[in-house]
Amino acid sequence: MSLTKIPENVQGAVSIDPWLEPFADVLSERRYLADKWLYDIKHATPDGSEQSLVDFARNAYKTYGLHANQQTKEIVYREWAPNAQRAFLVGEFNNWNEESHEMKHKDEFGVFSITLAPLENGDFAIPHDSKIKVMFVLPDGSKVYRIPAWITRATQPSKETAQKYGPTYEGRFWNPPNSYQFKHQRPKFNLANDSIKIYEAHIGISSPEPKVASYKEFTQNVLPRIKHLGYDAIQLMAIMEHAYYASFGYQVTNFFAISSRYGTPEDLKELIDTAHSMGILVLLDVIHSHASKNSEDGLNMFDGSDHQYFHSLTSGRGEHPLWDSRLFNYGSFEVQRFLLANLAYYIDVYQFDGFRFDGVTSMLYLHHGVGAGGAFSGDYNEYLSRDRSGVDHEALAYLMLANDLVHDLLPESAVTIAEDVSGYPTLCLPRTAGGGGFDYRLAMALPDMWIKLLKTKQDDDWDMGHIVHTLTNRRHGEKVVAYCESHDQALVGDKTLAFWLMDAAMYTDMTVLKEPTLVIDRGIALHKMIRLITHSLGGEAYLNFEGNEFGHPEWLDFPRVGNNDSYHYARRQFNLVDDDLLRYRHLNEFDAAMQNCESKHQWLNTPQAYVSLKHEVDKVIAFERNGHLFVFNFHPTQSFTDYRIGVDVAGTYKIVLNTDRAEFGGHNRIDEAQEFFTTDLEWNNRRNFIQVYIPSRTAIVLTRQM
């Protein structure tokens, strides 16, 4: 294929996927928009000098909002509010006086500012952790009170305050006398060479007790578990401040504030620093796809207008049709400043190592992936046709800039993940090739497949070819995070894999004091096999939601009116793993063995596996990846002796992982000391074969001895 007629800025993408050639001009236009914005940002300085994207983002979070100068003891506050006529800083520091601290009149861009000199005794004019708001006078003369848009601390009101004034969150001036000092270097991560295994976690539910757990409890109690399991990254959910706990963190009100339910900003810094000391990366589940409709404690109607940060409500683009939330106007320069600064802030101030971008499908399309527009078939016209795709070019351009920024800030450790169900081509190709710049996308079809199998098919009817196709159906050159279940499957109304497999028997039959029932025996065996085949065949990275590694027995339901504000299901029962008399520890130890086996033998971040066998009658799947041989026998009753498995490289093979070990809840039917010698005869299109014993519902991983 000749690239001479392909626009230079997307030649890399087309060389990776020649099917993109008819759409090269569209791809080029989309990249050009992001590059134009980048040019505008670099030249948006008062003196006309050039600034980097990193400088732009850092200067923004260091300029806007409230900032205390530790040397001069001055406090400077800046706020962009173009619709407001006047602005006043009010709070406990001035007894909520509406007149005493008027901000300087907005400049030509709509920015108000005020500088507060220190008190006569040399203290800051605003005490640390005291309540604060900004009051705007609108064009019609009315007044509105808002939490500053760039606030770094917001808290729930006391019961007495809530009863009197409502549950609106309270902004606070965070300026601790002794801020946390990071002690440990970030772990390095090289996308080209390193594997990544991600533990998805929610701080508030990370306790067996029915309560909101804390950052400190997570640091002390959960981080050591994650380290033991062998995960090398944590993805923290529901960190950005959200007034409604039951929203799972997806209705963000205060973008620069971390959730105060779990503790202080210094507590979160300690958590991340401790994770780094263990060699664990920490990723933030970042919500830039939408925002809460709250106005008094959120961004909505912040300066009295409906279109400051968001598309106008009259435009048809200002609200999400399903989420009851506001949608950002990514084409606005000030919105770009706000969101890009938000990313830089979390990287610099909290030392996050990257982001999982939530709701990317909703961002990418004007139809938000809802209704007929969300029925993606894989036809390239659905993504790249000028007439049919419905792509939001501005949102895509913002995501490109976001990836540029994160990788510029963290050249040795950045990780960006897109939650995209649509399969948008080039999303996870490098920006230099004309792609979106993400490192990974979530393989969202995989959990759907497993749930559908368990809901609708008997074990004898499992289609091996369909399983393999779904696990390997991903775009060449674009990495995916494989997972068989995440927080989505744990939510009330759905079931975890363990619950689909064992249901109510998990409450009565998980004891080791009696022989496992048929239901429990099947459930434990398939739970391990599903996780291992997803891990080894489904992608270039792996993700697990907290508790699912040991088959957490219950769904996740946050306290709300519908459940009488109960915390009973808003917790993770780690006590089940610690009980030696329960079989949950078997699943937990298998998960640890699987993660640590991958760390030692490295199969995730390697080329796609070669699948040599998908036997529908025997229910056997075999494949090779990075020199390792994986064999799965999904047959419910049939074990096979001297079963021939094709293998490309001759030599002696030994088992390095076996799901049937007793400590993993298995039956110890396999002799792991045995060596397997290849026979120099072609089998299943491989140059050699070995013969193995594979019991029913068992998987083994073999590695050639060097």
UniProtKB/Swiss-Prot annotation:
InterPro entries hit by this protein: A-amylase/branching_C, Branching_enzy, Glyco_hydro_13_cat_dom, Glyco_hydro_13_N, Glyco_hydro_b, Glycoside_hydrolase_SF, Ig-like_fold, Ig_E-set
Catalytic positions are 358, 419
**Which parts of the sequence bind (1,4-alpha-D-glucosyl)n?**
96, 133
- Cellular compartment(s): Cytoplasm
- Mind telling me which GO cellular component terms the entry cites? cytoplasm; fungal biofilm matrix
- Regarding temperature, what does the record state about activity? Optimum temperature is 25 degrees Celsius.
Descriptive protein name = 1,4-alpha-glucan-branching enzyme
Which GO terms are recorded in the biological process aspect for this UniProt protein? glycogen biosynthetic process
Q: Any idea what job this protein has?
A: Glycogen-branching enzyme participates in the glycogen biosynthetic process along with glycogenin and glycogen synthase. Generates alpha-1,6-glucosidic branches from alpha-1,4-linked glucose chains, to increase solubility of the glycogen polymer.
How sensitive is activity to pH?
Answer: Optimum pH is 7.
Q: In which pathway does it act?
A: Glycan biosynthesis; glycogen biosynthesis
At which residues is there a site annotated Transition state stabilizer? 488
**Which EC numbers characterise this protein's activity in its record?**
2.4.1.18
Subunit comment: Monomer.
Q: What are the UniProt keywords, alphabetically?
A: Cytoplasm, Glycogen biosynthesis, Glycosyltransferase, Transferase
Give the reaction(s) catalysed.
Transfers a segment of a (1->4)-alpha-D-glucan chain to a primary hydroxy group in a similar glucan chain
Question: Which EC class does it fall in?
Answer: transferase
> Glycosyltransferase among the record's keywords?
yes
Example of a GO MF term: glycogenin glucosyltransferase activity
Q: Which family does it belong to?
A: Belongs to the glycosyl hydrolase 13 family. GlgB subfamily.
